[in-house]
């Protein structure tokens, strides 16, 4: 499944992206982020991370550097811990 998803991303990068122009507000671009996320985290978790990233890429977003989290990090637990610390 990973191979199929990465092939689809390569097709998008070569065939579709040049027609749309560079619109991504983040570095790396959303398609590069998706490819890295799928390579490092597998098809299911990588796709989840990529969809979250694309949802953050909109005209009202400041953008910037947004790297794929390392494979051993649990982003959900970290986010929940941050939310708890803000409630204190």
Curated annotation (Swiss-Prot):
Region (Disordered): 68-88
Gene Ontology cellular-component annotations: plasma membrane
Extent of Basic and acidic residues compositional bias: 75-88
Chief place where the protein resides: membrane
UniProtKB keywords: Cell inner membrane, Cell membrane, Membrane
Membrane topology: Peripheral membrane protein
UniProt superkingdom: Bacteria
Keyword set includes Cell inner membrane: yes
Function: Could be involved in insertion of integral membrane proteins into the membrane.
Record-given protein name: Putative membrane protein insertion efficiency factor
